[in-house]
Each structure stands twice: as C-alpha cells, then as structure tokens.
C-alpha cells in the first residue's frame, strides 16, 4: 500500500471514531493497532475487558475496501455487537444456527455484493469447506479472531473448535490477521502467534489494570446472610453472582427471589429458551441480578454491570480477571467481591488431584495456587493481580480492601493456644465447625456424647464470636500450624510447628477478621462529575422507553457514561450533543431530538411531575 494511501486511511480513522462511534479520542494503544491493521500487518492485541478491543477491527473494517470477518465464540456476543454497530449506522451482520436458511442466504448475498462490511461468525461455521470457498470470492480484507486465548491449551478457556483456525493461514496467506484477547500470559501469547500463524505481528499489550473496579474480599462465615446484606446494599444495581455448581446457582437464585430481589439462575443445564430469556431480560435492565456458573458472561457486553460477586473462588486468576471484567465496562465505578473460605480451595485441590497426571494437571495446579495466593494476600490485591500478568507494578492502588482497610494485627498467642489445645484434646478427629463449638461452649448433644463438655478448654472462648474463632483457625492453617486432612472429612490436625506455640516459646501475631464489607461507593463522588442526578434518572427512563420500543437493550441507545455526561453538560443543540462521548452522527439523527427536548424541558423546569 502506498505511503500516501496509508496516511489518508490513518486520518480517516479519527474521523470514523468521532462521527460513527461518537468518541473524541482514542484510548491508549488503539491508534497503533488500527494503523498497523490498515497497513496490512498482523496484530496480537491483549487489552482488558472494556478497554475498546472491538474498535481496533471495526474502524479498519469501515476504511478498508472489502469484507472484515470476525470470529466470535458465542451467538449472544455476535448479536450484541451487530446490534450496536447497526445502531451506529454500520453495515454488519452475523451468521449463526439460530437463523433461518432464508436469513443466512440474505447475509451471504450481502457479503457477496459488498453491502456488508463486518461479518461475525463462529469458528466451526467458518471452517466448513464450502463456506471457505464462498469467503474466497468475497474479497476479505481482514480476519479478526476475538477471544483468541481459546486456541491455546495454556489458556484458561481452551476450545477445540478454535484449534482448526490455524488452517486459515494456508488458505489465505496474504490476509491480515488480528488476534484479540483480554487475558493471555506470555506462554499463551506465544501459543496464539504460533497456532494462528501470525507473521511478524505487532504485539500490543495494554495494561491489565481496570482502575474503576474496586477489588474486595469477604471471608465466609455465614455466607448466605453476608451475600443478602451485600446485595441489598447495592440498591437495585445490575450484578452477576458466580457459583461453582449448578445446584448452588439454583439455590442462591431462589433465596434471593424469596427476599424480593430481582434475580434469576443461568447455567448450561437449563433449556436454551430459558437461558436466552434470562440473558435478554438482564441486557434490557428488566432483571437486576443473574446467578450463574461460568457458562454465563462470555457473551455479555452489558456496560452497566456495577458489581460481580464470586460466591465461590474461581480455579485460576485468568477466569477471575475475565469474570470480574464484566463489571464497569462503561468506565464508571464498579466492584468485584470475592467470598472466600479456604475449604473451597481444599475442595478444588481435591478435584484437581482426581484428574489424570501430566502437563495439563501441572498447569492447572500452578494457576490454582496463584488464585489461592491472591485470596490470602495481605498486600494490595491489584498489585498481586497485575504482577501475575507481568506488569511489575509497585505502588498500591488505594482502591481494594487491603489498601482501604489494612489488616489490623493483635497479640494472638492466647487465642492460638486455645485453638491448638482444643484440636489436640478432641484427638485431631474433628472439623473446624465442631472445634469452634467446643471452644465457645456450645450446649449440644454431639459434644455431650463425646464427653467434650468436660474438657478444660470447653467454653474457654465463649466471649468471642463464632466468626472470630473460624478466622483464628484459618490463620493457623495459613501459618502451617494446623492442617486439614481432606481424606478424613477435613479433620483439623496439628503440625510439628504448633508445639513451640503451645509451649509459649514464640510470639504470634494474628489479623483481626474481616467480617463486614466496606460501604459501597457513591457513584457521583467516585465518577468525579458534578452531574444532575434527577436529570440522569429522567434520561435513563427515556432511554428505557426508546429501547423497549425499538426492541434493543438500553445501552445500545446510549450507555450510562454517556447519560452522565449529558446530565453534566446538558446539551440542547446538535453541536453540543455531538461533543458528548458516545454520540455519533447516526445516534444523533435517531435519538438526539428526544434527549435534547427532555434536557431542555428539565433546564426550563417544564417537566416537573
């Protein structure tokens, strides 16, 4: 491509960004990726969820003369992307199994005639021989592979159907490739380059940091009560709650519903029609909370998810990062809350040991251990997370539970001696719950049957809470003074390191347990904008009415960040409206008049109810 032509395309990229997508400036890394794609060179893009990956191939698609093909793993994700592109006036379509034959033929005709600029397709459909024959005649100019980590067995979400994509390089040797992912360590990145056959690619790795997400951890004591309190504090905000089993998903959703909370279960065992209904209600703000297994989320592009809860610890940091990344995609404050119990880690380790030995098991063990270290960290959680991905950060973030409420320590020798002595006196045969009951002097038949109500240690810790003693024992496990014997129903047993503590030969500091979460943030202060909250509420109401009428999710009209900017700037003319991020020419034409009329009426005081 001639130099003058490349320069012309590059200047056109900024124009497309502003006029079509309504953004005034590129985010870090986007411009370099777009320029590289326009020059015909392969790219590997590692950019956080919500960092603007999609624009990296959508803008070149509108500047290059031909068809851009986007490989995407989920139908819901394709549909969502196409809806948003159509709302911006972009000729986009998808091919998937939910379409009738007539619909599919219509899309293929649009690709053949050049009417369609962006085609979204699943990998298994793309790799059919007859489809590749069609594609060869459609003048493809760019192939974008989204969720590219799925091609690598080192990745946390390997999908066999992605493995076949490597054959595309032989079929289309001159076609520029762009591989995109939010989560890939160095090993996974090298795998993606090798398996897709990328030629001397630009490797653009943006920071993994999502500064608008507050990373929090709450120790499990009475998990359901803690979860209910946490959800009620969110006051109707959109959220996702992840659990590790279908049964727990169903139970948690039912308990939330019984408290009058708008929640629904989502997992792979439900009928497809039910899953689609839950997803659409959530996308359209008709459902507050989805309780889900990891089957939910990869196809979700809802920008205003304000919190993500992991009710069970994930198996690796990559999954945790990707799932928490569903929150705050609009750039506004969001929260990631991890409920943690070391027993959950023990269960995951036991499940792992039941798998066949070999390299894959070793990889999974390494990743699980890293997740456990994140949960048990006593330093800034964001630092642990970012340094896992190799960023080498050193400054604490000031926006996680550790930074906001540093662990407080106390002289824990006496508590440790009571706990260790009780474990020894009950002959190291009982689990944590029973040991705590003995320490606190519980009056129950089981303790009397074993005669443990006659022990010296019985009731020695009754003045402190159940949660306090659970925390003490967990810390003794972390310190290597106690072990849980999984083979004996997680019975607590003393290690040799417990002896000097029992004798009082060494000092011992313990952390005060974290039982109550920090107060949720107020969006107005955290966002930093002095916006009119009443106007924001009116704009949301108008957006919902338009979205319902047009049968699209509300954020396809405008996302929350755009509405907040409107509520701050109060634009009442076309030029003022176009200066708001997220308002392009097409959206101004479609929706601008109604929003400007509402703002004008609000400013004039003519719309008081």
Swiss-Prot record:
Residue intervals of the Helicase ATP-binding domain: 34-202
Domain HRDC: 529-609
Top EC class for this record: isomerase
Cofactor(s) this protein cannot do without: Mg(2+); Zn(2+)
Domain Helicase C-terminal: 223-371
UniProt record similarity statement: Belongs to the helicase family. RecQ subfamily.
Record's protein name: ATP-dependent DNA helicase RecQ
Source organism of this protein record: Salmonella typhimurium (strain LT2 / SGSC1412 / ATCC 700720)
């Amino acid at each position: 491509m001639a130099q003058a032509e490349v320069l012309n395309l590059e200047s056109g990229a900024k124009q497309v960004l502003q006029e079509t997508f309504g953004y005034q400036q590129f985010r870090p890394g986007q411009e370099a990726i777009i320029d590289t794609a326009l020059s015909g060179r392969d790219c590997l893009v590692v950019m956080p969820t919500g960092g603007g990956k999609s624009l990296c191939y959508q803008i070149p698609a509108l500047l290059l003369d031909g068809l851009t093909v986007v490989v995407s793993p989920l139908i819901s994700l394709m549909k969502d992307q196409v809806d948003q592109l159509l709302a911006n006036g972009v000729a986009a379509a998808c091919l998937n199994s939910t379409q009738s034959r007539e619909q599919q033929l219509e899309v293929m005709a649009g690709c053949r005639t050049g009417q369609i600029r962006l085609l979204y397709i699943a990998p298994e459909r793309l790799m059919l021989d007859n489809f590749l024959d069609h594609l060869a005649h459609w003048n493809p100019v760019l192939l974008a592979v989204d969720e590219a980590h799925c091609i690598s067995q080192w990745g946390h979400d390997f999908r066999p159907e992605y493995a076949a994509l490597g054959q595309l390089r032989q079929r289309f040797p001159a076609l520029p490739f762009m591989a995109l992912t939010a989560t890939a360590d160095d090993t996974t990145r090298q795998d993606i380059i090798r398996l897709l056959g990328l030629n001397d690619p630009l490797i653009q790795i943006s920071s993994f940091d999502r500064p608008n997400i507050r990373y929090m951890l709450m120790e499990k004591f009475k998990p359901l009560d803690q979860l209910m309190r946490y959800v009620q504090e969110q006051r109707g905000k959109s959220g996702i709650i992840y659990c590790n089993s279908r049964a727990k998903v169903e139970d948690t959703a039912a308990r939330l519903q019984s408290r009058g909370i708008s929640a629904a279960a989502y997992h792979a065992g439900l009928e497809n029609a039910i899953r689609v209904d839950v997803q659409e209600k959530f996308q359209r703000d008709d459902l507050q909370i989805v309780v889900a297994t990891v089957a939910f989320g990869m196809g979700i592009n809802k920008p205003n998810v304000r919190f993500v809860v992991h009710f069970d610890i994930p198996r690796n940091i990559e999954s945790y990062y990707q799932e928490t990344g569903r929150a705050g995609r609009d750039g506004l404050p969001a929260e990631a809350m991890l409920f943690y119990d070391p027993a959950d880690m023990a269960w995951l380790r036991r499940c792992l040991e039941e798998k066949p030995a070999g390299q894959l098991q070793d990889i999974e063990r390494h990743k699980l251990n890293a997740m456990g270290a994140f949960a048990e960290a006593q330093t800034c959680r964001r630092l642990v997370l970012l340094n896992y991905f190799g960023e080498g950060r050193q400054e604490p973030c000031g926006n996680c539970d550790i930074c906001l409420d540093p662990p407080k320590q106390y002289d824990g020798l006496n508590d440790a001696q009571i706990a260790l002595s009780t474990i020894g006196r009950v002959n190291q045969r009982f689990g944590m719950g029973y040991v705590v009951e003995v320490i606190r002097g519980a009056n129950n038949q089981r303790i009397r049957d074993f005669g443990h109500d006659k022990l010296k240690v019985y009731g020695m810790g009754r003045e402190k809470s159940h949660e306090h003693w659970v925390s003490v024992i967990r810390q003794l496990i972390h310190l290597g003074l106690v072990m849980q014997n999984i083979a004996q129903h997680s019975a607590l047993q003393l290690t040799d390191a417990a002896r000097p503590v029992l004798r009082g030969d060494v000092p011992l500091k313990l952390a005060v347990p974290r039982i109550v979460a920090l107060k949720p943030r107020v969006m107005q202060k955290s966002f930093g904008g002095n916006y009119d909250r009443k106007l924001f509420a009116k704009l949301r109401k108008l957006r919902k009415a338009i979205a319902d009428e047009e049968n699209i999710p509300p954020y396809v009209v405008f996302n929350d960040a755009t509405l907040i900017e409107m509520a701050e700037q109060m634009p009442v003319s076309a030029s003022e409206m176009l200066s708001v991020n997220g308002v392009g020419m097409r959206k101004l034409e479609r929706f601008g008049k109604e929003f400007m009329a509402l703002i004008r009426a609000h400013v004039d005081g003519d719309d008081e109810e």
